[in-house]
Amino acid sequence: MASAEIIAVGTELLLGQIVNSNAAFISQELAADGIYVYHHTVVGDNPARLKEVIEIAENRSDILIFTGGLGPTEDDITKQILAAHLQKQLVEDEYHMNKINEYFTSRNRAMTENNKLQAVIIEDSIVLNNDFGFAAGMYLRENNHTYVLLPGPPSEMKPMFTSYANPLLLSESGDQNILESKIMRFFGIGESQLAADLNDLIVTQVNPTIATYAGDNEVVVRITATAKTKEEASRLVKDTEEEILRRDGTFLYGYGEVSLSELVTAMLLEKELTISAAESFTAGLFQAEIARFPGISKIFKGGMVTYSEETKQSILQVSPQVIKEKGVVSAECAKEMAENVSRLCKTDIGISFTGVAGPDSLEGHPAGTIWIGLSVKGYETEAFQFVYGRDRNHNRRRAVKQGFQLIKQFLDAN
């Protein structure tokens, strides 16, 4: 089985100015391909050190994947150093040169000479088109090694890898097996607990393989199987999926790359249910999240951010008696907030968020104590309590995701 090394080029990575998210993405994709990544390397924009890294990588890896250093500036040196190392010439790629020329011509701007560097490639390489930028990527087989050169910006790198580089890697892997992969997304359970629940499957795994990843307040499980036929590979994945669902299916919210908020929004659109939100400590995060999706104006009618007791009473019309007797961190307050925003905005669903963001306590409640109210036309209003930690922004983000999960659970049941 081929081994790969990912080499990220850029001094900004070493200085901590940019996080190397490219390596994580490529590693996950290669794992699904059955290609093992044994090394991640980060090197600055220094010719001597980059050459040294290339030589080290060639001694231990079959596939060298570079990210970064393909741009027009003096510190973009990746292809120049690799070309010299392989004793290859640099040549101009017509497609990318025309693309750059057209860009500047259409804007009536003069193209500086250094921009042409983005259209320069190593001779004998397969050009990887950059659909979202100008720097050409490259795929090259030389001396029993495969070299893949990708741009640094993730918005350019990811589509280039997915559309052009990865199919080439798969075609040359020599493995004629069919590969099937499925991503499962869980909310409300930690990675350590999920991994513990699946421990016997993970420890004894051969085919399929199971990998767990901690996401943003969620856990991702990836099942990957190989077989001689698509049907057999799919069956292997399905059997493992069913076993995982048997153990932790109550925490599953979806599959693939669809986020929880995107999934819930699609469900609301399909059912033509309108929604509004009243937010206290989340300060509009729920509304900002749901507003990200196209067509949302059909169902999202508006909302209110009522951070203080005064605005909860004056704008959201929460009863002063409820606030005085029960406090703002209470089921009663959460219910009234949800009911009132639904009534004021004339929506089918009203959701509310109130609680203690942290790190300090409030009304005797520890940081991370939250209440989410859910009011649905024709149903009894409910309030749900959750207790998180002391991290303020983590609590706010998690509460918003919890709100989407509560809506999904209601929609699934009704």
UniProtKB/Swiss-Prot annotation:
Q: Which Pfam families match?
A: CinA, CinA_KH, MoCF_biosynth
List, alphabetically, the SMART domains matched: MoCF_biosynth
Tell me the InterPro entries matching this sequence.
CinA, CinA-like_C, CinA_C, CinA_KH, Competence-induced_CinA, MoaB/Mog-like_dom_sf, MoaB/Mog_dom
Source domain of life is Bacteria
Q: Which family does it belong to?
A: Belongs to the CinA family.
Instruction: Kindly provide the name given to this protein in its UniProt entry.
Output: Putative competence-damage inducible protein
